[in-house]
A protein has these predicted regions:
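Pair of pore-lining "gating" transmembrane helices in MFS-fold secondary transporters
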Residues: 53, 160-182
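Short amphipathic helix-loop junctions that connect adjacent transmembrane helices
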Residues: 184-202
Length: 297
């Protein structure tokens, strides 16, 4: 719904900033719920659910508005590069934030965590406001649009009636579920089966993100710099490679003494990155292939 409103209003910046504010509220509420668990578990659980709902809403409002901004103002031939740069910055931000916050948290205490979350969220809101200031004033739309006003339900029906869009939406839902599934099991798996220490399992996650970084970079250079391969083919290759990597990681547990877990995890990250950046590029191309103003939907 928020994405549709930014479609109608044409003000992506406002929704990017508003999404970050809502995300910050959710993150701070989640941190404040931690000490509440020792006083009232039920209240803490309910507030935690609310906090993560706010986090999801904030990420959706800010993230989809940013992607729609890219789709609206980026030429077709540059969309793979735009998606690559955006996701590379995201991966870099995750790694940088985790490193800095991890050092600031030592020695750990709930009070220290709450202060760090508050400071970090205030900083991100400030940076978002600065970098998006007047950013849309000097931009031109790649395509002109004639559809300025329509109901959300009507817009959704029109988009969903497109069989290509419907198939792609279902595909993204299933593939992203698989994409994030490994986050729940990979680190415990490495500790229980391969006897990794917490520090080693954390490094394993960093290795995977390094693979993601290189996979994204490779697809961006191949598609934009060398005009090699269509985005849909890169999406398929990334999915198949990720599937094979997960199977090999599972089989490696049968011989944990000799199995090369770290290279396999790096390979999983590489194919994850290949899939992710190609899927985002395909999504932006699909969103702007018509002349109507429905990139956010």
């Amino acid at each position: 719904k928020w994405g549709f409103i930014s479609d109608v209003q044409g003000n992506r910046t406002k929704w990017i900033i508003l999404g970050m504010i809502i995300l910050a509220l959710g993150a701070n509420l989640a941190a404040l719920c931690i000490p509440l668990y020792s006083l009232n578990t039920t209240a803490a659980t309910l507030l935690s659910i609310l906090a993560y709902v706010l986090i999801g809403l904030g990420v959706g409002a800010s993230g989809t508005s940013l992607l729609a901004l890219l789709a609206t103002h980026t030429a077709q031939r540059r969309r793979a590069a735009a998606a690559t740069i955006t996701w590379l910055m995201m991966i870099f931000g995750i790694a940088l934030t985790a490193t800095i916050v991890g050092k600031l948290l030592d020695p750990y205490s709930v009070q220290r965590l709450i202060k760090i979350v508050f400071g970090l969220t205030m900083l991100t809101i400030l940076l978002t406001g600065v970098v998006t200031l007047n950013i849309e004033r000097g931009l031109e739309r790649v395509k002109k649009n004639t559809n300025q006003s329509q109901s959300f339900i009507l817009g959704l029906k029109i988009i969903w009636s497109n069989s290509q869009t419907k198939r792609f939406t279902i595909f993204v839902f299933l593939s992203m579920t698989a994409y994030f599934m490994q986050e729940l099991i990979l680190e415990p798996y490495s500790g229980l089966v391969f006897s990794f220490t917490p520090g080693q399992s954390t490094s394993l996650s960093g290795m995977q993100n390094g693979g993601v970084f290189l996979g994204m970079l490779a697809v961006g250079i191949a598609c934009t710099g060398f005009k090699f391969g269509a985005l849909k083919n890169w999406v398929s290759a990334g999915c198949m490679g990720s599937c094979i990597s997960l199977i090999l990681i599972a089989l490696a547990g049968q011989s944990p003494e000799i199995a090369p877990l770290v290279p396999l995890v790096f390979g999983l990250g590489f194919f994850n990155g290949m899939f992710a950046v190609a899927a985002i590029g395909s999504m932006m191309s699909l969103a702007s292939q018509n002349n109507d103003k429905r990139e956010e939907i």
